[in-house]
């Protein structure tokens, strides 16, 4: 047959394990020293440029960090490539909120229920082959986790992530103050 299309994609192979003794990469006990990295590049704005992302990752590595959490959306492909090259581990995060507002101007609303599956699929399909990605976060300080309905949604999202990638753990950030307010039926 005739070649219709081709793609060259770098990927990495490594083993990850967690147990009562810690986190292990390729059998070696590994302590994570991490930072939250927002998607902006200072004066460059929210654009992602390879050189800027590599520079940022290199500065973090030289400062002693070996891990980052994307705050609070999936990480750019340029930053993931830099983390792959420099040996920086990544917690790949989806959202900052689901349905309950953290401030009057955020995007928390019922549309979350229509789009979360597509967001999860897109992130995992894009980032799966990056060895730097060691885990997924399905939310940052999610208020709904203070409610039974929120906990059920968390389980549903986590299981959906695992259906696409059972090799990496899934976590979700909890803010007990916001969760307590949500439990009482209050949001911001």
Describe the function of each predicted region:
Residues 54-62, 67-188:
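Substrate-binding/catalytic cleft of secreted carbohydrate-active enzymes
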Residues 1-62, 81:
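N-terminal carbohydrate-binding accessory modules
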